[in-house]
Amino acid sequence: MAAAVAAAAAAAAAAASFQVLEMESMETAVAGSASLAAEVRGSGTVDFVTGAGISTLVDTGGSDPGPEAEDFECSTHCSELSWRQNEQRRQGLFCDITLCFGGAGGREFRAHRSVLAAATEYFTPLLSGQFSESRSGRVEMRKWSSEPGPEPDTVEAVIEYMYTGRIRVSTGSVHEVLELADRFLLIRLKEFCGEFLKKKLHLSNCVAIHSLAHMYTLSQLALKAADMIRRNFYKVIQDEEFYTLPFHLIRDWLSDLEITVDSEEVLFETVLKWVQRNAEERERYFEELFKLLRLSQMKPTYLTRHVKPERLVANNEVCVKLVAEAVERHALRAENIQSGTLQQPTSQVSLLPRYGQNMDVIMVIGGVSEGGDYLSECVGYFVDEDRWVNLPHIHNHLDGHAVAITESYVYVAGSMEPGFAKTVERYNPNLNTWEHVCSLMTRKHSFGLTEVKGKLYSIGGHGNFSPGFKDVTVYNPELDKWHNLESAPKILRDVKALAIEDRFVYIAARTPVDRDTEDGLKAVITCYDTETRQWQDVESLPLIDNYCFFQMSVVNSNFYQTASCCPKSYSLENEEAVRKIAGQVSDEILESLPPEVLSIEGAAICYYRDDVFIIGGWKNSDDIDKQYRKEAYRYCAERKRWMLLPPMPQPRCRATACHVRIPYRYLHGTQRYPMPQNLMWQKDRIRQMQEIHRHALNMRRVPSSQIEC
């Protein structure tokens, strides 16, 4: 009994002791809270404090009580959560669904159905219980664009994107990422792939990207790729990938009026090549594609010698009939021309060239007209239609400038007008526009400009206050920069150039007999090796074709020395070119040329195939009544005689001319182009100065006339 009482007393004492300790603990906590509240009150902020299982909102002080509740958001929580979930997926923790990619090496990818269903609407119905995939926990992924299916690394990256929202896309993986994004309805990832491909769009991949854009309905990407293909169609059809396109895309391109092509003959050969790549499957499409060709734009000889005998044409009644109609149309046109009957312009679109068809044009650039006015207007002789057309203005006053033709541009540089003597512009035929590029390093005119291996070489020239230049400079279009090379051994003025083997530059020029004066100029012909940078005088230009023969037959005349000549490039080897150098040159090419033409100065000379053109110039250079010319002459190699062409819209001298191929869209109808703003302002300024000068002269004449009276 005593023991029981003692035990009860001990228990009561222990309970009392615990209550005391609990009260002390509470007091300590309250005291701590009061102390912390005092500190907070001093700082003027609000904190949410958690202590010993009791949450207390602490007053911030001041007259207005703080809010009773506030929201808390951890900015990194979502990203950390998605990262942890992805780590769990990679370790196979808590996964409840398996994605089976039969093509990806037979690999299976474990995942969480809740994450996949939240990431994309593709998985929401699939895993909601209505389909067998939800019950079995396996989703079979089949039917991919390629037989093996997407690479395992790409699949892993896209699944990781659904967890984390991050992915790295490369040019090698973008097509598979795009296919997976399209399959899984990952809209933002699909749009990103479209923007990525836009940045990587290039002539070498535009066909493939255009196909991808169509396949996955990326409309903006498809438009941009189509525009690149359309403007470079004549290059695109040289790529083997073009001939892997399906019928409907080939049909769409042949139906396009804007595709840039060199001729309908090329399109006919393109259709044949596409069909022959898989004749068994594609021959049934030939008739439909053949109907899209503009046979009336093909030469009659080509129709009869190449198109008509072709097996696919000869065995098809519809195709045979179309060829016969085109040949008959050509015969009727020739009969009208021979009889002098004016042919009414056709309104039938199928009989006209495609708007994107490249047409042969002799382009005339810059120069001076009557009254000494500089001409910024460019004009072109449209060879097929035997008429002159207007082309865009240049932004400079060009006189004594040089011209050079590259694969994509026409470059003009230099001028006698000091304000434009260093300026370089280039013309883009596909866009029908001029643009400025890096200026020359020296103000000059009457120099040589020619292309070698994609770079422009500027050689020699003449300055307004210099007897001439020996300098050689090179322009790199990729860097848009000029740099100096070693100078020529002598001054070279009035330079005409030919390029051989994409290395050697043959030059006909004049050099001063006395370097200290401009009097006494002698003709010189020399060869420059652009690789060794060595110079060697030669007896003549290589007599390769009519253009070379013509230049050498007039090389010592004032007509040639004051003319501008478009440079020409030849692919033959230099050894063969050297064998064509000769001391004696036949002047047979001049026999049918009117004698008065060779008395012209400041003419523009250029070539088209094996024909030669002489355009503009002036007569009576020493007389007050200088006669500016607008006549143009053409040496027809086929007929071996000179012909007088329709006159230019206005006379001009010291212009340059060159052959260029321009899309028909810029040539049909009557084109009008505005004068550039910088030249408009300068023209107004000159007019004002002339009026001031005229007024000053009138003021001086008044007293003089009064005295005479």
Swiss-Prot record:
Signal sequence extent: 1-15
Residues with the Phosphoserine modification: 466
Keyword Phosphoprotein: yes
Residue ranges occupied by any BTB domain in the UniProt entry: 95-171
Keyword Phosphoprotein found: yes
Entry keyword set: Kelch repeat, Phosphoprotein, Repeat, Signal, Ubl conjugation pathway
Highest taxon of the lineage: Eukaryota
Matching InterPro entries: BACK (IPR011705), BTB/POZ_dom (IPR000210), Kelch-typ_b-propeller (IPR015915), Kelch_1 (IPR006652), SKP1/BTB/POZ_sf (IPR011333)
Positions of Kelch repeats: 361-408, 409-454, 456-502, 504-557, 611-662
Domain BACK: 206-308
Subunit (UniProt): Homodimer. Interacts with CUL3. Component of a cullin-RING-based BCR (BTB-CUL3-RBX1) E3 ubiquitin-protein ligase complex.
Protein purpose: Component of a cullin-RING-based BCR (BTB-CUL3-RBX1) E3 ubiquitin-protein ligase complex that mediates the ubiquitination of target proteins, leading most often to their proteasomal degradation.
Record-given protein name: Kelch-like protein 11
Gene giving rise to this polypeptide: Klhl11
